[in-house]
């Protein structure tokens, strides 16, 4: 059984830090407070705790700082907010004058560094009402136990749009992301060696240099930290174009498949059972979800009915009856039994919904996609004519435009770019002129679509001996990278360090005398060395899965993967389509 979320990885680390730096800092026995959150801190707290946890910390009400609220002048307020003008102005409005103060006093905790102009604004306006004003350095969302996101929705556009007018916006986004990544490292108590993928774009290089400088500054200032030199961890920064295939391929592992094929929003799955509409949240508190989310759909469909039978046999052993009334009685006596059944019903529905979509259209696509992605068929024979593999998909009227675009992209990726003439012909024949930018704009990510010169394809690790399903032969590039990083096999020209490489990662035994003392290299790895990965512009659920798989295989090193956001193929193609549009038009379309 999976441990509860309170004991689970990154979420637990973040919650413990918030408890220590926020709640323990302002807690008084028997005193209740109102808590004010902005959009980001609402997501942050929701990702790592429940309302019951907040009640235990003396919080009686949680409110949105942006909304109009009734004054509660007899109570103190705890503000957990981002250091932005909008959030600070809302706080100042609450304490506009002594006679109009909304609350008795304020405890302010910023997620990260508060700029001097905002700090001085607070100091000048209402310093007498403030009991605390601190920065806690947690400016990311722990999405899963080994996954973090920065929640920077504009990052993809600013980092990859070709519009030179976006240069200032891009610089600002880069600074923000660097600050946030530093808080990830600080929360994990790490000062990693920073490396980046050197080609084809310079985003990763720029961001890595910023992060390196900010890490240096952070550990100079943070007197409480024992870490001054580099620790035994690595941080890899990568541009999204490093692996376009994994972003558009149909994945058949459970979580990736469900988020691709079904309308799951905010991790909420809607389904029907007994003629009633129901909702379920796909979260790590659900031990069954944790157990099966990275398994192939074929395995999931075998496993859930087996679990149903196990519970059924438990019921029979307990009651000796199989009637509905006996089952009802048992559920009353054993609430955990009802909870187990509910979970299994949810996941069986989810798996069946995935399979219905798969059988309808996706099954025929998958063989084509795998052959194009790998350049070989299921028997290991080389694909000689990629166009011949693609054509049946384009001629099939049952496939929608989005699936055809995904197949065309895989075809182009497989041959490392095509000619303008060939691309025009494909677009016209499939009648996707209005969506053609979903294909062409990949070039802004450094992916060869209509290349000026022939580029070599990166070499892949030989995985032919690994056991796979025929329609799931592709392995995301990021798994190769993670494994090579842990085994110290990354090419230093392709993956330069921003500063001197930590000794333990370059095979040397020397360790900085200033760094946090640890027993020895092997002991350190055993106690949890970290490989932290950051992808600029989104990660896929298949890449998320790789972080868990590699951690499981290399128990001496935990892989933590993160990005600006977690993407699905459809959302990514929509974002790519907008890259050559003006920023105001992009915002307008998204608002609609």
Curated annotation (Swiss-Prot):
Subunit text: Interacts with DOC2B; the interaction is direct, occurs at the cell membrane, excludes interaction with STX4 and regulates glucose-stimulated insulin secretion. Interacts with STX4.
Domain of life: Eukaryota
InterPro entries recorded: Sec-1-like_dom1, Sec-1-like_dom3a, Sec1-like, Sec1-like_dom2, Sec1-like_sf
Lineage: Eukaryota, Metazoa, Chordata, Craniata, Vertebrata
Keyword Membrane appears in the UniProt entry: yes
Function summary: Together with STX4 and VAMP2, may play a role in insulin-dependent movement of GLUT4 and in docking/fusion of intracellular GLUT4-containing vesicles with the cell surface in adipocytes.
Subcellular location: Cytoplasm, Cytosol; Cell membrane
BP GO terms, sorted: brain development; cellular response to type II interferon; insulin secretion; intracellular glucose homeostasis; intracellular protein transport; negative regulation of calcium ion-dependent exocytosis; negative regulation of D-glucose import; neutrophil degranulation
Tissue and organ expression note: Megakaryocytes and platelets.
Main location: cytoplasm
Coiled coil: none
Keyword Oxidoreductase: no
Family (UniProt): Belongs to the STXBP/unc-18/SEC1 family.
Species, as recorded: Homo sapiens
GO terms under cellular component: apical plasma membrane; basolateral plasma membrane; cytosol; extracellular exosome; phagocytic vesicle; plasma membrane; platelet alpha granule; presynapse
Name by which UniProt lists this protein: Syntaxin-binding protein 3
Record's keyword terms, sorted: Cell membrane, Cytoplasm, Membrane, Phosphoprotein, Protein transport, Transport
Modification comment: Phosphorylated by PKC in platelets in response to thrombin stimulation; phosphorylation inhibits binding to STX4.
Region (Mediates interaction with DOC2B): 1-255
A Pfam family reported for this protein in Swiss-Prot or TrEMBL: Sec1
GO MF annotation: an example: syntaxin-1 binding
């Amino acid at each position: 059984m999976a441990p509860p979320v309170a004991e689970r990885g990154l979420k637990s680390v973040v919650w413990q830090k918030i408890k220590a730096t926020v709640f323990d800092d302002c807690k008084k026995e028997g005193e209740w407070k109102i808590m004010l959150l902005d959009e980001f801190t609402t997501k942050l707290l929701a990702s790592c705790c429940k309302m019951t946890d907040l009640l235990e910390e003396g919080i009686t009400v949680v409110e949105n700082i942006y909304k109009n609220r009734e004054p509660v002048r007899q109570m103190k307020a705890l503000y957990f907010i981002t250091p932005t003008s909008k959030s600070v102005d809302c706080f100042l409005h609450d304490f506009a004058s002594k006679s109009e103060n909304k609350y008795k006093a304020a405890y302010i905790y910023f997620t990260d560094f508060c700029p001097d102009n905002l700090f001085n604004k607070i100091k000048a306006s209402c310093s007498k009402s403030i009991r605390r004003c601190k920065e806690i350095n947690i400016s990311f969302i722990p999405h899963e136990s080994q996954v973090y996101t920065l929640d920077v929705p504009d990052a993809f556009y600013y980092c990859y749009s070709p519009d030179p007018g976006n240069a200032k916006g891009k610089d600002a986004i880069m600074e923000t992301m660097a600050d946030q990544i530093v808080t990830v490292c600080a929360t994990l108590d790490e000062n990693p060696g920073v490396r980046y993928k050197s080609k084809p774009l310079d985003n990763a290089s720029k961001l890595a240099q910023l992060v390196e400088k900010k890490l240096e500054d952070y550990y100079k200032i943070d007197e409480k930290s024992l870490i001054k030199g580099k620790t035994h961890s690595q941080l890899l920064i990568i541009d999204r174009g490093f692996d376009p295939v994994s972003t558009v391929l149909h994945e058949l592992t459970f979580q990736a498949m469900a988020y691709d094929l079904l309308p799951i929003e905010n991790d909420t799955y809607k389904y029907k059972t007994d003629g009633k509409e129901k909702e379920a949240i796909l979260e790590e508190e659900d031990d069954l979800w944790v157990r099966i989310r990275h398994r192939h759909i074929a395995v999931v469909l075998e496993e859930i009915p087996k679990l149903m039978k196990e519970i059924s046999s438990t019921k029979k052993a307990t009651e000796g009856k199989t009637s509905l009334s006996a089952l009802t009685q048992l559920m009353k006596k054993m609430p955990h039994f009802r909870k187990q059944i509910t979970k299994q019903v949810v996941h069986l529905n989810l798996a069946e919904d995935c399979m219905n979509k798969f059988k309808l259209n996706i099954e025929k696509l998958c063989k084509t996609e795998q052959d194009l992605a790998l350049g070989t068929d299921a028997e290991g024979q080389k694909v000689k004519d990629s166009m011949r593999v693609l054509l049946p998909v384009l001629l099939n009227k049952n496939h929608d435009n989005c699936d055809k675009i995904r197949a065309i992209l895989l075809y182009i990726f497989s041959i490392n770019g095509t000619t303008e003439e060939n691309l025009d012909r494909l677009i016209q024949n499939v009648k996707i002129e209005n969506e053609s930018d979903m294909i062409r704009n990949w070039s802004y990510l450094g992916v060869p679509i209509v290349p000026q010169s022939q580029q070599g394809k990166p070499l892949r690790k030989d995985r032919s001996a690994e056991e796979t399903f025929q329609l799931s032969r592709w392995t995301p590039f990021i798994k190769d990278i993670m494994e090579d990083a842990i085994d110290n096999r990354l090419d230093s020209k392709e993956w330069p360090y921003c500063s001197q490489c930590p000794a333990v990662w370059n095979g040397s035994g020397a360790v900085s005398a200033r760094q946090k003392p640890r027993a020895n290299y092997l002991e350190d790895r055993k106690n949890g060395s970290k490989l932290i990965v950051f992808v600029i512009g989104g990660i896929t659920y298949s890449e998320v899965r790789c972080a868990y798989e590699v951690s499981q295989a290399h128990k001496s090193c935990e892989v933590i993967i993160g990005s600006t956001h977690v993407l699905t193929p459809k959302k990514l193609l929509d974002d790519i389509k907008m890259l050559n549009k003006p920023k105001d038009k992009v915002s307008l379309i998204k608002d609609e």
